[in-house]
Design a protein with these regions (language model features):
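Conserved helicase motor core of SF1/SF2 NTP-dependent helicases
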Residues: 11-12, 80-83, 164, 203-205
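Accessory interdomain/linker segments of ATP-dependent helicases and helicase-like nucleic-acid enzymes
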Residues: 19-127, 233
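A structural connector/turn signal
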Residues: 5-6, 74, 107, 156
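A generic local structural motif
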Residues: 2-5, 25-28, 157, 184-186
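C-terminal accessory regions
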Residues: 107-110, 114-233
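Hydrophobic alpha-helical scaffolding
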Residues: 11-12, 16, 47-48, 72, ...
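Single conserved hydrophobic/aromatic residue that forms the stacking wall/gate
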Residues: 1-14, 18
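Short gly/ser/thr-rich secondary-structure transition/capping motifs
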Residues: 1, 67-69, 180
Length: 233
């Protein structure tokens, strides 16, 4: 992170009204970015603050059901127009196109890759297809039978975020599997942010992760970054 506030919000949870305001209004304004450009990062998939649970909670808050928005349910997941989604496997055959401001295709190609993120632009029940607009401007049409290649991406694992950067990241600080609650995971999450890191939850969990060096030390600057976050001289 280059310049930004780092905020440990006491014992607040992601369902807290103030926390929701931070995610939907304060952070986007602070980093001059759309809320869809922010990213919640969590160590695990299966826990009270794992990816699956957080995506359900944040979808309900940031993109709730609306009579004007089409939906498609796949297994336990509801995909809704306006949802943030991620491609979860490499698919070299998926065709894409980029459009000009008049909606006319000006560039075409194929290949969508693991980790690509975008927003659901359209769900067409008649054609049984979902159109996703990816961050780089590509439009991709998925048949309903291909939706197992997508998942909601309001929250993703820290591992999945490696190699990516975001204007701001939100990191829930709650107890999880000890093997995942370590300094390396914390470092990876913190350094995904270009401007701002917001930590929500229990400050003691932050301390536990900072002190858990069970994995090989790989980052010489981590101590300095942790002190910066904690405002320690």
């Amino acid at each position: 992170a280059e310049d930004g506030i780092r905020d440990v919000l006491g014992s607040r949870g992601l369902g807290d009204v103030y926390t929701r305001q931070v995610i939907s209004e304060k952070l986007p304004k602070y980093v001059n970015a759309d809320v869809s450009e922010l990213q919640i990062l969590t160590p695990s998939r299966k826990s009270s603050v794992g990816v699956d649970r957080l995506n359900t909670v944040m979808q309900e808050y940031l993109n709730p059901p609306d009579s004007g928005k089409m939906e498609k349910k796949v297994g336990d997941t509801i995909f809704r127009e306006g949802d943030k989604v991620m491609q979860i496997k490499n698919d070299y055959q998926l065709e894409w196109e980029k459009k000009n401001r008049y909606g006319i295709a000006v560039e075409q190609g194929s290949g969508v890759f693991n980790g690509d993120t975008g927003i659901i632009d359209d769900i067409n029940n008649y054609n049984q297809s979902v159109t996703v607009k990816f961050e780089d401007g590509r439009y991709v049409d998925y048949e309903f039978t291909q939706l197992d290649e997508l998942e909601l991406a309001y929250a993703i694992t820290v591992h999945k975020a490696q190699g990516s950067e975001y204007p701001a990241v939100i990191i829930p600080m709650y107890q999880g599997p000890r093997m995942l609650m370590n300094r390396n995971i914390l470092y990876t999450a913190v350094t995904r942010a270009r401007k701002c890191v917001c930590m929500i939850g229990d400050e003691r969990i932050f301390n536990q992760m900072a002190e858990n060096v069970s994995e090989t030390r790989r980052y010489s600057s981590l101590d300095e970054r942790i002190k910066e976050i904690k405002n320690i001289e």
